Curated annotation (Swiss-Prot):
HAMAP family: PlsY. This is Glycerol-3-phosphate acyltransferase. The gene is plsY. It is an enzyme of class 2 (transferase). Probably interacts with PlsX. It comes from Edwardsiella ictaluri (strain 93-146).
Length: 222
């Protein structure tokens, strides 16, 4: 491994370790996403707790965390294998951030950003797949899972030389969503949107000492 490749991998991990959800919520005076809602510091949980504007900011920053390192590696003409390692490093930084006690998010938005430098046509297909799945099912996690499963086939069709690194990235996303897959199978996964009345009742009735639910876990009034 060259010094350039090693440096890019380390840089990607450090970029991924910047938790935009925590920083945006702190700057906006919103609750810490690690201690509220699902407990997951990601755009979906920020959407539930803080609204669309804060969630949009988190989403953009998370995408850039994956896009910038991989784009730099791409311009340096690194091999597809090391491009894949750079993308995985960015996602690992998001999932296990060194700056925030290794407690991070799911890595979906960062993975989208890491794939973007391969081609905007591929990125459009990926975003379209996620959006269509969420609109039809209401499950953000299902959108991520379906997108991760189909991503290697999209890449194989457009730029087959990147199939292996994207497949590695997809495996990481699927492993990270193993709890969501189990809840989807049992029919206990929560949807991305909830009625405001149900949310207010759930928040008012939950004991202060109660631990936050898992990401995308159904949150109904007791």
């Amino acid at each position: 491994m060259s010094a350039t490749a090693l440096g890019m991998i380390i840089f990607a991990y450090l970029c991924g370790s910047i938790s935009s959800a925590i920083l945006v919520c702190k700057a906006a005076g919103l609750p810490d996403p690690r201690e509220n809602g699902s407990g997951n510091p990601g755009a979906t949980n920020v959407l539930r707790n803080g609204g669309r504007l804060a969630a949009a900011a988190v989403l953009i920053f998370d995408v850039l965390k994956g896009m910038i390192p991989v784009w730099l590696a791409y311009t340096l003409e690194m091999s597809p294998f090391y491009l894949g390692l750079t993308a995985i490093a960015a996602c690992l930084g998001h999932i296990y951030p060194v700056f925030f006690r290794f407690r991070g998010g799911k890595g979906v938005a960062t993975a989208f950003g890491a794939i973007a430098p391969i081609g905007w046509d591929l990125t459009g297909l990926m975003v379209g797949t996620w959006l269509l799945t969420v609109l039809l099912s209401g499950y953000s996690s299902l959108g991520a899972i379906v997108s991760a499963l189909i991503a290697p086939f999209y890449v194989w069709w457009f730029k087959p030389q990147f199939t292996f690194p994207v497949a590695m990235l997809s495996c990481l996303i699927l492993v990270r969503h193993h709890d969501n897959i189990q809840r989807l199978w049992r029919g206990k996964e929560g949807k991305i949107w909830r009625k405001k009345g149900a949310k207010s009742a759930q928040n008012s009735e939950r004991p202060a000492s109660a631990s936050p639910p898992h990401d995308d876990e159904p949150q109904t009034p007791r």
